[in-house]
Every structure is written in C-alpha cells, then in structure tokens.
Amino acid sequence: MEPYDDAVVEEHEEQEEERTEEKIINEEYKTWKKNAPFLYDMILSTALEWPTLTTQWLPDKQEVPDKPYSTHRLLIGTHTSSDAQNYLQIAHVQLPNPSAPNPDDYDEERGEIGGYGGSSKKAPMEIKFNIVQKIDHKGEVNKARYQPQNPNIIATMCTDGRVMVWDRSKHPSLPTGQVNPQMELIGHTKEGFGLSWSPHTAGQLATGSEDKTVRIWDLTTYSKGNKLLKPSRTYTHHSSIVNDVQYHPLHSSLIGTVSDDITLQILDIRESETTRAAASTEGQHRDAINAIAFNPAAETVLATGSADKTIGLWDLRNLKTKLHSLESHTDSVTSISWHPFEEAVLASASYDRKIAFWDLSRAGEEQTPEDAQDGPPELLFQHGGHTNRISDFSWNLNDPWVLCSAAEDNLLQVWKVADAIVGKDLEDVPTEELEP
C-alpha cells in the first residue's frame, strides 16, 4: 500500500472515531436531559457570544424587593477567534429565590428547570443573564480573579505572560477601544493560568506560568505614573510548566504550587533567602498535576487534580504519601474547588465534560455491587450538562449549592443540585424516577 493510501485510511479511521465519540456524547446528554428534573432544583443555560476560559462569582448579592429573584454578579472573559477584540466582563445573573421546584416545570426543549415562578407551559424560563460591563483586554483572558479585600480590583492572566490589574470602578460600562489596565505586572516570559490573591494581605498576588516560574507581586509598591510593576519574588523550584498556585486560606505565609513536572510543592514566603520550596512531593501522581485547592476549613488538608484522571488528597504535615485518591473521571482533571461551607465536599472538573461532587465523609463506606457500578462511595453527584470540555467553574458564596460552569463551546450554565441529593436526608432521592 502506498504511503498516501495509509494516510487516507488513517484519516478515515479518525473521522469514524470522532463520529462514534459524538454519538456517545449525544446519547449521554439525552439521558442527562431526561433525568434533569429530578437532579436539580435549578438549571439555567445561556450561550455566550464567545467562550470564556474563566468564571468566578463575585461575593455580593442584591435582593430585589417584591421580586422572585436576587441579582448576583459574575466575572468572565472572552476567548475570541482571529482578530476579534477580547474583553474582561461583568455579568448580572438573576437567580430565582429558593422554592420547591416542580419536575412538571421542566422545559425539555431548553433543558432547564427552576425559572421565575412559572411552569414551562407559561413564560419561557430563560436565564436572566446580562453583561453590564465590558473592558477591552489584550488577547484572551486566561484567568480572572477578584481581590478578596476589594472585589473591584481584578487580576487577569494574558497570553503574552503579562498579568494585568484592573479597577473596574475606573472603567465605563462599554468598551472604549483602548486596553488601559491600572497596572501591568512584568516578569513572566510565557503565558500562564496560575493566579491567586492573598486572602490575608491586600495587594499580594501569586502567579504561575509556562515559563516554569512562580512569581509573587506586591501591588502596594506601585507608584503613580508608572504602570509597570516587577515581581517582589521569583521562585524557580519547578522543572516544567506551573499549572496552578494557591495561597493557603488559613496560613498567610504558605503558597501551594503544582506543575507538569508531577510535583506538588509548598512555598513558605517567610524564608526570604531562597527560591526553592519548603516542602514537596513527587511520584504520587502518574501525570501532570493541573490544580491545587487547600481546604478552607481543615487547615492541614489539601487536594490536587491530575492529568492521570485522579484527585489526590494530602495532609500538609506529611506530603510523602497521599491520604486518599478519588477516582471516577475518565479524562484529565483540570480544576478543583472545595465547597465554601461543607468541609468534606469537593468539586472537580475534567476533560470528560463532567463536574463531580465528592463527599469525603463517605470514604470507606460499604457498597452493594449495584451501587459500586455508579462510582466509589465518595462520589456524591456528577453534572452532565456540558457536551464540551469545561473551562472553569465557581461556587456561589451566597447560595451554597449553586455553581456556574463554562465550557469551550460558549455554553455557560448556572445550576443547583436538588436538596434531595445533597441535603441531609438522602432517602428522598427519587432514584426510581431516573432513567438509565
């Protein structure tokens, strides 16, 4: 057979594989849609003009008098194609006030439940989602996070390695056509996705990049008249791409970092004379570590998400071996986040298009063979509403089981798992209603 023929056969096989995968994705989505009325108290969807790689609920909530909803704010970006302008964006999202949802209110065509007080037979239940501010941004927004001490201050990771800092109160609602951040943090030589504000010290920021470095920035050293700021510290403790960084929520001097070099490392910024880590572990994951999350309520517990499809749980006092491994995802785990109020609950997103909830208090529970087919005992729930890779997700601090998730195909979803599933009385879960 000629080499040309081999290429044709290979291309044909790839097309067949793609068609098969598409068919599987569509079948899974159909099943999810059928079961959605019983799985969610609310599920609302909107298609963005451009996909966003980043999403984060802002910490405030506005009650609207005599209305069946409250207004929440969401921080998103854009990932445009070709030369289209990118934006840092603030959206208002109107979330229905809590009420007992009726599965009969499910809008099958839209795949939504939990609208504004009317069943699907009345008004259409469209998500009340409105972009209220668009700020010109250079290149796509890899990641955007607000400063905890002042949510108007937002840091963004750019595709050229720069970190931009914005005071959104100093920008108009509509874009001006000029990229005009309040500060530009200069030091990284390649783009990155690791970005974490210190929850303890206003103006302190940690970033990680594909240039293999972690950099610490002190925004309080900024002087008017010069937008450019250099890092106060540069760490070179990783030997490959740094994927994620996080300040410890309870220890102001500790920062966790993870990398393609398959290590988890802990920096102690009190050690001023070193560019190395204070503690590290390697060989516990089998592939790149993509994400890190410290438990906000248990100071020694942290989690890592890996391209080996697993989530590792660790005790900060002994990083030599994992405490436990969570296994159910069928592809790389890309982001993880602890529940803001439930100490034992962790959420994870994966390239398998799913977001999983894990309840660590269930670890080691006995299962029937039938239960084991649905996953390990810790697997509390899987969100299957996306048919494309998930870019980012965020817990809502004002409504503890509400999440926002964004996928690579422009779809943004806001959803709340049914109380029957995540509430204390798990016997209420209508499993007999679910379709296989």
Curated annotation (Swiss-Prot):
Superkingdom field: Eukaryota
WD repeat residue intervals: 136-176, 187-227, 237-277, 284-324, 328-368, 385-425
Gene name of this polypeptide: hat2
Keyword flag RNA-binding: no
Keywords: Chromatin regulator, Cytoplasm, Nucleus, Repeat, WD repeat
GO molecular function, one term: histone binding
Pfam families: CAF1C_H4-bd (PF12265), WD40 (PF00400)
Assembly mode: Component of the HAT-B complex composed of at least hat1 and hat2. The HAT-B complex binds to histone H4 tail.
Principal location: cytoplasm
Cell location: Cytoplasm; Nucleus
PROSITE patterns documented for this protein: WD_REPEATS_1, WD_REPEATS_2, WD_REPEATS_REGION
Function noted in UniProt: Regulatory subunit of the histone acetylase B (HAT-B) complex. The complex acetylates 'Lys-12' of histone H4 which is required for telomeric silencing.
Protein name, per record: Histone acetyltransferase type B subunit 2
Source species: Aspergillus fumigatus (strain ATCC MYA-4609 / CBS 101355 / FGSC A1100 / Af293)
CDD domains cross-referenced by the UniProt entry: WD40
Listed InterPro entries: G-protein_beta_WD-40_rep (IPR020472), Histone-bd_RBBP4-like_N (IPR022052), WD40/YVTN_repeat-like_dom_sf (IPR015943), WD40_repeat_CS (IPR019775), WD40_repeat_dom_sf (IPR036322), WD40_rpt (IPR001680), WD_repeat_RBAP46/RBAP48/MSI1 (IPR050459)
Family label: Belongs to the WD repeat RBAP46/RBAP48/MSI1 family.
GO CC annotation terms, alphabetical: cytoplasm; nucleus; Rpd3L complex; Rpd3L-Expanded complex
Keyword Repeat listed: yes
